[in-house]
């Protein structure tokens, strides 16, 4: 059953690929060394879903499980923390390698740097990561959240000591609001995981921070005897994580990259629409962007991420809510000896896309386009755990958002 799923093979004109070098292994290792200096750091699991792979007729399915990241239940802190570190390092005229966690969090550093106010917009995970990092480093955070934000996600950020509001506008308008406030605030800075003309340095640092999870996964695969995945499926909101993941693999395996697909929420499928347009330019999606995949409810793409994606992605997909909910249930009810994975609505959609391509009779053309077969080694990203526990239980226990159901209906 592929009801509501739309996809396209990437035929967008290629650019000069000037941003790919951002995601070189060398640059990503620099970010990873920074993260390793945090006492809360540990490598998150790469879950081996061997029974599911056998059921679906592929060699392997591996899931990078970010529900364990820094105790925050999501990957986003990797980007915000690294961008903060890079910003402070730049302001002080120092290299980030000179500013590990114990230096950044010291009284001496605060005397030297002072205190900045980091503004951001978020559906929950990015803002929580920014607030967490600001709190640990003795800085201030102001977070704007879009309408429809759940109380749990709001409360999680308040607990980190940030100033937080829920606004009556969508995510993209919250970004504009936070940027305008930062510009008017002394020692204010916008830390956003999307880029636009004139604002690219901090988003590029955020993407490099996200690279930590890809570097870990790549190293974990090698420890399991896998040289590289044949397929990588990753979700996208603005495309920062997707650009980081695709960029890392495209740069490292230039001569033999994996087949890579990007999965978006159908209510906010700006990258898919941009791919369909085939102009090379981003197409925005406006309106309320209603989807259970709150972390993917972004209608305006990251210009840096898009530049990488249009050059290296094979398939762009626009995915309905039920596909995400189904994958959340699959993770929660594993086959055989497969591990149980807690994957929230924004975390699970790549597995839902993979399952549909391999399992559904009317998805044979998609399976063929993705070149999936019995030798395929698939890597999917689960970017969050149950960041909204009530919604998670409704999906897993009550079967919410079954076939043909979506938040917008």
Question: What are the residue ranges of the model-derived segments?
Answer:
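PLP-dependent amino-acid enzyme catalytic core
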Residues: 1-409
């Amino acid at each position: 059953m592929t009801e509501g799923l739309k996809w396209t093979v990437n035929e967008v004109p290629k650019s000069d690929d000037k941003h790919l070098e951002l995601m070189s292994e060398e640059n990503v290792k620099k970010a990873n060394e920074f993260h390793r200096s945090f006492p809360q750091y540990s490598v998150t699991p790469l879950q081996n879903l061997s029974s599911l792979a056998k059921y679906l007729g592929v060699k392997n399915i591996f899931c990078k499980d970010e529900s364990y990241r820094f105790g925050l239940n999501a990957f986003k802190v990797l980007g915000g923390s690294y961008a903060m570190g890079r910003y402070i390092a730049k302001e002080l005229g120092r290299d980030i390698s000179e500013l590990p966690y114990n230096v950044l969090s010291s009284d001496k550093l605060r005397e030297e740097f002072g205190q900045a106010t980091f503004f951001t917009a978020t559906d929950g995970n990015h803002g929580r990561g920014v607030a967490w990092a600001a709190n640990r480093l003795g800085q201030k955070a102001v977070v704007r959240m879009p309408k429809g934000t759940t109380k749990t996600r709001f409360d999680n950020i308040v607990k980190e000591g940030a100033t937080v509001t829920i606004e009556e506008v969508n995510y993209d308008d919250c970004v504009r609001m936070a940027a305008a406030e930062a510009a008017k605030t002394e020692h204010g800075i916008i830390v956003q995981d999307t880029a636009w003309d004139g604002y690219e340095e901090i988003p590029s640092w955020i993407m490099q921070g996200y690279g930590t999870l890809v570097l870990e996964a790549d190293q974990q695969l090698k420890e399991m005897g896998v040289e590289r995945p044949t397929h990588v499926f990753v979700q996208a909101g603005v495309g920062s994580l997707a650009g980081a993941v695709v960029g890392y693999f495209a740069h490292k395996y230039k001569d033999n990259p994996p087949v890579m697909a990007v999965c978006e929420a159908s209510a906010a499928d700006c990258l898919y629409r941009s791919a369909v347009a085939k102009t090379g330019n981003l197409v925005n999606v406006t309106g309320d962007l209603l989807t259970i995949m709150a972390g993917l409810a972004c209608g305006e793409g990251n210009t840096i991420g898009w530049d990488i994606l249009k050059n290296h992605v094979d398939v762009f997909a626009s995915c309905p809510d039920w596909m995400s909910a189904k994958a959340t249930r699959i993770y929660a009810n594993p086959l055989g000896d497969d591990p149980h994975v807690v994957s929230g609505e924004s975390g699970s959609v790549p597995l839902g896309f993979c399952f549909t391509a391999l399992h559904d009779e009317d998805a044979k053309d998609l399976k063929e386009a993705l070149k999936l077969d019995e030798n395929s080694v698939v890597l999917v990203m689960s970017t969050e755990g149950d960041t909204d526990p009530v919604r998670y239980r409704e999906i897993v226990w009550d079967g919410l958002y079954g076939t043909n159901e979506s938040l917008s209906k």
